[in-house]
Amino acid sequence: MTRYIGNAFSLGMVPRHLLAFVRLSACDRPDVVDLVSCVGHADTAAVLGVPMARISVTLQPGDVLYVAQLRGGRLPEGCVTLPEGFGFDWIRVEIEPSVR
């Protein structure tokens, strides 16, 4: 099982599977230290405290993707902390067994 952190989700990340999307409260957000980063934007990665990694991810059954969905607009260039009025909505994407 691999646990990822990303700033977006694409249907191209999964071959024909059922998906479960769960919105997380601030208390339930993951510890980013143990996650594989697939955050493709440098400023978003800096704010989240993870390395920027423009990698292709194909999720498999048992994998989990934690999506940090930016709220408030685009981050200013070179941003390393969240500006006032910005935040992240956290969503856990879980891959279920194959659909036939």
Task: Give residue ranges: language-model regions.
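Polybasic, proline/glycine-rich intrinsically disordered low-complexity segments
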Residues: S10-G12, V57-R100
